[in-house]
């Protein structure tokens, strides 16, 4: 981007007009269209640099600063044109006249083969001879007071139009004194404190003088500084209150046969696309306009009553980047208060609120639109409208591409539209001819009885015109050649970079001098290239990259964008990669791509990892032996684009083979039939994952024998009849961690490779829970195209998209699948399905514990086991616990258990994953004695039947809590690398507190896709955490009761259904985060039924009674009594019935005395009732 100081300077320099006769070899340097503020999102796209310069028919721009600087070339020159007084020449609406001959300034125009007479094509100076001569003559008569020509020829004296505040060029003038100039309203506000002391209203004579300006002079845009305004407050007025319409903008003066150049920034179809003009003047205009819009509308507020009209040019805030841009109103929806606008400097359009639209200030230069609407001339769509296939194909060829078009006709529509003749740079063919050849269009006037079909032979003839061919000009020409290797080739090389023995890069030593020359050329080229902040290469592009370790330039390929300002690049001549800032990249030229890519991707032949994966130690051994050393490289096979090679170090005697060294060190074992395997896979150079038929893959599960006893950890659980375990033998988990790391590295380096999912096929699958890749089996292909996969090392089933799958390499299948499906033997559900209570209890018994499993039976569906918890003082068999608590039934034999065990009943309890974590039924809070009254603070209100509070008095268990915190810290730190944990609402868990990063016991209040809201159960704090900061809590850490208490509002409450929201609102206002007095009335299942009282100005308020008085709840005591009365059989022999009647009478009397103590008629009625 243009630096701010250059941008400001550019407004003060005189831009020389283009020469229409002289052919330029290069266009002016490309600058972006925005100000240097960080605004990367434009209404459309950046203006791209052209391939060739402007050779003819470029356009000339008129600028205010040209006149001013031209007048400064000779201080003795006085302008004869009064239009220069305010630094601007132009025409008012509907009354534009050309300036006098000899004036070096013209309206904005696009040049053609015959330039206008008033414009000099080769100005030798900035002041014409005619003007100089006239000025000299005027000065000869300067002292002749009686000379009438003095007043007839001279305009107002030329004033300095530099900003009084900052000294930059400024065309805005104080409308009160009309003497002081400013560059912006911001500068005038800052200067008002000093200027207000000398600012006086302009004299009447000056007003008359300004009223007598020539008709072709555009009125200066002035800034009014009212005397009665406080310091720093100014108001901007326009020269007339009328709206700015499209016709008010300065004209481009396009003509037929004129050639224009620019970038296609918006493409709808061949009859409607926009080209953003390219020239240094347009860039300056856009930069100036961007700065002015930002300053003028920075703190603008919507105008009351302003309603844009169709055809009005206004300023609209673009939704994507929230920047202000000029736009033309195409439609207005008054009811919805929305406007449909088209951004005239870019070509795109959108529907935005009217509040985001403001009138265009007349204080801004009325530059012509930078984007012109175009249509392809000489062709019309075959079927009446352009097909989707046509739009897609042509858009791929033109969109964001620099092009040169010839204006064939100018159509007068709502906005200016040019019918253009466009030549495709990729093939040299005219676009209208290509559309006809491909069957998408016909010549005007041609009759076609049937719709033409796409001519496939034409597609072959214009092969360079297909979607893929758009890369010919800007991408294929910028991709270095690839060295080809054949089986049997042998050369002296250097191992440049090693990932693993199955992924490393070699260089041919014979090309070393060419590579050194290339590095010199790169350094020389990049040293002279001006850094471009608008260079945004696409993924796959080759460019020059400055390596971070030595600051030297190398050829690199863009692999991915790490952020908006950084990319991951791979150095194509060495094989290594790193993340670089965009500032360390620059475009590459074809000359630097003559040398083929020197990094050859290789695989070491004859070996495979002894542990199933290549360990860091194995990689180190190989690096010590061959990296950056001259070795003999022998190609024994091809694996797609990678070479299967043998590396031999002949500098020592005897010769050392890299494969044999790895085998001897114990990190690798010999792989048989390597050469046959490599030769059989030598096909076209396509990625291995999609070439030819899929390779037959083999995999195994963890193996067991009946009556074998092993240590296990439950990693996934659906029910006691289906859960998944990790068997802790032979360092299985350590090997799995290493495998997962290698798998993640492999998948991160490989782009999506078109993996075709097949049910039962192993693959690499992306788990969104933690953003890592894991081994999986395809379980189901859904109608939507998504795939359900079973993560074989953990047991969970997830739905993923096709781009979240990758082919898996055979070496990743050597380690047996670790997530073994299991079920508890000797038990069965009471009914057909496992109950939630049984599942929750089983969950509480196994969470986070290392258990002992005895294998009872083995079937194709998994392993039937007996689980025993040895962490307790005596062995605890899990199935016996469930039977003893009457949650499950004991079955007679393993076969019976198998028959009654539901298979894959995921829907029995939950369609989501059920993690092994204690639910709300398993954890306990401290219990208070009945009838005890305590002061407490209410922490969270779930409902009137459940809220959490913490006593105000300090707990006596502080020492135990400190010990528990230390144990939790040790436990949670040891759980790193475990699968992502998703708790449920009400579960107990371990949570990592933000302020100190320590782990504490917590209760889950709410959950979302990425966050969880927790209540710290021993301290009362509440915060929202990412899922990465919560872990399941083992049952052993729940033995100490939570220091908070679970409460429910005292029993006699019945909420009206329609008032539940009001009840919750009242409870939150009355109790939440406030000190209250709790009186324990009863305890049921660790929930305290309490009455809540709160101190107020009028004394203690009972919350429950307050709800009853507000009509949001009712007392159930009387209702229950009346209900129980109805249930008691009427018996004359029972005294309880009579006693109940007497009680009810006395209750009525007491209620009467309380409510109606002075009502005599009612008093007599109550006496009769008492006597009856």
UniProtKB/Swiss-Prot annotation:
One GO term of the biological process aspect: germ cell development
Composition-biased stretches (Polar residues): 118-129
Null allele phenotype: Male sterility because of postnatal spermatogenic defects due to demethylation and subsequent derepression of transposable elements. Piwi-associated small RNA profiles are altered, piRNPs accepting the entry of abundant cellular transcripts into the piRNA pathway and accumulating piRNAs with a profile that is drastically different from wild-type. Piwi proteins are delocalized from the nucleus to the cytoplasm.
GO molecular function, one term: zinc ion binding
UniProt-listed SMART domains: TUDOR (SM00333)
Outcome following mutation: residue 774 to N: Strongly reduced binding to symmetric dimethylarginines
General function of this protein: Plays a central role during spermatogenesis by participating in the repression transposable elements and preventing their mobilization, which is essential for the germline integrity. Acts via the piRNA metabolic process, which mediates the repression of transposable elements during meiosis by forming complexes composed of piRNAs and Piwi proteins and governs the methylation and subsequent repression of transposons. Required for the localization of Piwi proteins to the meiotic nuage.
Name of the protein this chain belongs to: Tudor domain-containing protein 1
Species of provenance: Mus musculus
């Amino acid at each position: 981007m243009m630096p701010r100081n250059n941008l400001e300077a550019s407004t003060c320099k005189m831009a020389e007009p283009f020469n229409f006769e002289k052919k330029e070899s290069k266009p002016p340097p490309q600058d972006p269209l925005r100000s240097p503020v960080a605004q990367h999102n434009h209404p459309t796209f950046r203006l791209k640099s052209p391939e060739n310069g402007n050779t003819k028919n470029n356009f000339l721009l008129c600028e205010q600063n040209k006149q001013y600087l031209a007048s400064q070339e000779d201080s003795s020159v006085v302008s004869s044109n009064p239009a220069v007084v305010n630094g601007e020449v132009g025409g008012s609406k509907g009354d534009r006249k050309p300036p006098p001959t000899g004036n070096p300034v013209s309206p904005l125009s696009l040049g053609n083969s015959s330039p206008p007479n008033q414009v000099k094509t080769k100005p030798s100076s900035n002041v014409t001879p005619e003007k100089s001569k006239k000025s000299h003559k005027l000065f000869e008569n300067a002292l002749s007071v009686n000379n009438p020509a003095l007043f007839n020829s001279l305009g107002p004296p030329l004033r300095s139009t530099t900003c009084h505040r900052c000294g930059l060029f400024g065309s805005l003038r104080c409308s009160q004194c009309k003497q002081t100039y400013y560059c912006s309203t911001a500068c005038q506000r800052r200067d008002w404190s000093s200027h207000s002391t000398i600012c006086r209203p302009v004299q009447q004579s000056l007003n008359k003088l300004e009223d007598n300006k020539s008709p072709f002079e555009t009125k200066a845009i002035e800034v009014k500084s009212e005397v009665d305004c406080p310091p720093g407050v100014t108001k901007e007025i326009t020269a007339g209150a009328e709206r700015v319409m499209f016709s008010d903008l300065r004209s481009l003066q396009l003509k037929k046969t004129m050639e224009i150049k620019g970038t296609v920034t918006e493409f709808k179809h061949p009859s409607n696309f926009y080209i953003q003009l390219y020239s240094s003047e347009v860039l300056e205009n856009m930069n100036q306009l961007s700065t002015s819009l930002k300053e003028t509308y920075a703190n603008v507020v919507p105008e009351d009553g302003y309603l844009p009209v169709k055809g009005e040019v206004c300023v609209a805030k673009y939704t994507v980047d929230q920047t202000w841009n000029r736009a033309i109103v195409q439609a207005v929806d008054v009811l919805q208060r929305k406007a449909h606008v088209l951004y005239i400097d870019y070509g795109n359009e959108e529907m935005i609120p009217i509040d985001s639209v403001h009138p265009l200030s007349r204080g801004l230069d009325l530059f012509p639109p930078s984007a012109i609407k175009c249509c392809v001339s000489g062709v019309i769509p075959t079927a009446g409208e352009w097909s989707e296939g046509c739009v897609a194909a042509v858009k791929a060829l033109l969109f964001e591409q620099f092009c040169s078009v010839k204006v064939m006709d100018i159509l007068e529509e709502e906005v200016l539209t040019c019918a253009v003749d466009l030549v495709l740079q990729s093939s040299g063919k005219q676009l209208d001819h290509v559309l006809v050849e491909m069957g998408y269009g016909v010549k005007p006037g041609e009759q076609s009885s049937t719709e033409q079909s796409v001519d496939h032979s034409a597609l072959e003839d214009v092969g360079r015109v297909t979607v893929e061919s758009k890369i010919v000009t800007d991408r294929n020409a910028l991709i270095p050649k690839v060295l080809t290797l054949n089986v049997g080739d042998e050369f002296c090389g250097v191992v440049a970079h090693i990932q693993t023995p199955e992924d490393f890069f070699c260089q041919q030593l014979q090309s070393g001098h060419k590579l050194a020359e290339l590095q010199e050329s790169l350094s020389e080229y990049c040293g002279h290239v001006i850094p471009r902040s608008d260079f945004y290469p696409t993924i796959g592009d080759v460019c020059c990259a400055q390596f971070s370790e030595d600051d030297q330039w190398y050829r690199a390929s863009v692999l991915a964008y790490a952020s908006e300002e950084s990319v991951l690049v791979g150095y194509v001549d060495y094989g290594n990669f790193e993340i670089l800032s965009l500032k360390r990249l620059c475009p590459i030229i074809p000359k630097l791509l003559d040398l083929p890519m020197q990094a050859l991707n290789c695989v070491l032949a004859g070996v495979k990892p002894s542990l199933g994966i290549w360990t860091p130690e194995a990689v180190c051994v190989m690096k010590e032996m061959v990296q950056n050393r001259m070795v003999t490289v022998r190609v024994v096979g091809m694996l797609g684009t990678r070479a299967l090679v043998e590396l031999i170090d002949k500098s020592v005697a005897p010769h050392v083979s890299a494969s044999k060294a790895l085998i001897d060190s114990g990190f690798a074992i010999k792989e048989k039939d390597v050469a046959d395997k490599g030769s059989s896979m030598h096909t076209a150079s396509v990625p291995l994952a999609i070439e030819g038929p899929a390779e037959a893959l083999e995999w195994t599960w963890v193996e067991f024998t009946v009556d074998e006893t092993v240590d296990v950890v439950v990693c996934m659980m659906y029910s006691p009849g289906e859960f998944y375990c990790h068997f802790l033998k032979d360092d299985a988990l350590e090997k799995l961690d290493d495998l997962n790391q290698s798998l993640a590295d492999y998948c991160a380096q490989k782009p999506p490779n078109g993996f075709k999912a097949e049910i039962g096929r192993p693959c690499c699958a992306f788990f969104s829970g933690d953003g890592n890749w894991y081994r999986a089996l395809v379980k189901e292909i859904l109608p939507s195209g998504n795939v359900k996969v079973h993560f074989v090392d953990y047991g969970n089933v997830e739905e993923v998209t096709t781009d979240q799958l990758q082919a898996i390499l055979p070496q990743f299948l050597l380690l047996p699948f670790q997530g073994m499906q299991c079920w508890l033997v000797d038990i069965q559900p009471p009914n057909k399905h496992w109950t939630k209570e049984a599942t929750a209890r089983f969950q509480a018994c196994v969470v986070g514990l290392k258990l002992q499993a005895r294998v009872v039976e083995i079937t194709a569906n998994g392993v039937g086991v007996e689980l025993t918890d040895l962490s307790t003082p005596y062995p605890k068999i899990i199935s016996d616990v469930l039977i003893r608590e009457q949650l499950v039934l004991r079955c007679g034999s393993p076969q019976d258990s198998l028959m009654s065990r539901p298979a894959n009943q995921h829907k029995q309890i939950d369609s989501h994953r059920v993690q092994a974590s204690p639910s709300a039924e398993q954890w306990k809070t401290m219990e208070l004695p009945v009838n005890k009254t305590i002061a407490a603070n209410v922490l969270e209100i779930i409902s009137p039947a459940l809220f959490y509070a913490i006593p105000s008095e300090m707990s006596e268990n502080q020492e135990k809590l400190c010990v528990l915190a230390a144990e939790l810290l040790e436990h949670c730190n040891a759980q790193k690398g475990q699968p992502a944990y998703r708790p449920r609402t009400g579960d107990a868990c371990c949570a990592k507190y933000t302020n100190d990063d320590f782990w504490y016991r917590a209760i889950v209040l709410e959950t979302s896709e990425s966050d969880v809201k927790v209540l710290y159960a021993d301290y009362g704090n509440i915060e929202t955490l990412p899922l990465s900061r919560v872990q399941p809590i083992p049952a052993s850490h729940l033995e100490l009761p939570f220091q908070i208490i679970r409460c429910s509002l005292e029993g006699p409450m019945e909420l009206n259904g329609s008032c539940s929201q009001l009840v919750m609102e009242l409870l939150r206002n009355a109790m939440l985060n406030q000190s209250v007095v709790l009186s324990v009335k009863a305890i049921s299942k660790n929930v305290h039924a309490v009455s809540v009282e709160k101190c107020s100005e009028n004394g203690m308020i009972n919350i429950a009674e307050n709800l009853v008085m507000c009509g949001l709840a009712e007392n159930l005591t009387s209702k229950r009594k009346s209900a129980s009365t109805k249930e008691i059989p009427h018996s004359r022999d029972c005294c309880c019935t009579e006693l109940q009647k007497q009680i009810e009478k006395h209750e009525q009397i007491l209620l009467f005395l309380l409510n109606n103590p002075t009502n005599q008629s009612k008093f007599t009625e109550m006496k009769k009732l008492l006597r009856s």
